[in-house]
Amino acid sequence: MEQQWLSATLKSEDGDVYARFAYHLRDVLSDSQFSRAVWSQLEALPTADLDDYMRDLDELEDAVKCGMERIHGCTMLLVLTGAGYRDLVFALRDDAEAIEEAIQSLAAEHPNRLHTKVYQGPKFGPFEALVSRVAAT
């Protein structure tokens, strides 16, 4: 399957947020097997150089994405980049096991730079509206 990412700029009270949505995976939003969401917030290392800042976030995103996708049933759907952070939103299958332990292990590899929470709930947890909004832009 060819990867296709949609991009949008969302307005928020904290400023503009640049969003990327994995359009090629949009069917996950209506798949009843994906009823949990994993939200990971990444923090960049302090730097005065914008290129270094973005490179650092890109490298951390790649490491987290690879780590989460090694977990059975985790699929990255949405990336949000704002001032000083990048959030990754993953869909998680109901049958994924040991997710909390895997996340703790991944966070230990990146101390104080990765904050992750698993959300339970139907229709991709509380983020269905956000993911759908980005997908519709």
Regions found by a protein language model. Give the residues of each.
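Short beta-strand->loop micro-motif that forms the acidic, two-metal-ion catalytic signature
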Residues: 88-90
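Generic structural motif
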Residues: 76, 95, 114-118
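Short, surface-exposed, polar/charged, turn-prone segments marking secondary-structure boundaries
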Residues: 40, 67-69, 106-107, 116-120
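Charge-rich, low-complexity segments
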Residues: 1-65, 69-75, 83, 93-97, ...
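Short Gly/Ser/Thr- and Asp/Glu-enriched loop/turn motifs at secondary-structure junctions
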Residues: 80-86
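Short amphipathic alpha-helices in soluble, non-transmembrane regions
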Residues: 99-109
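Conserved short beta-strand edge segments in small beta-sheet-based binding/regulatory domains
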Residues: 108-137
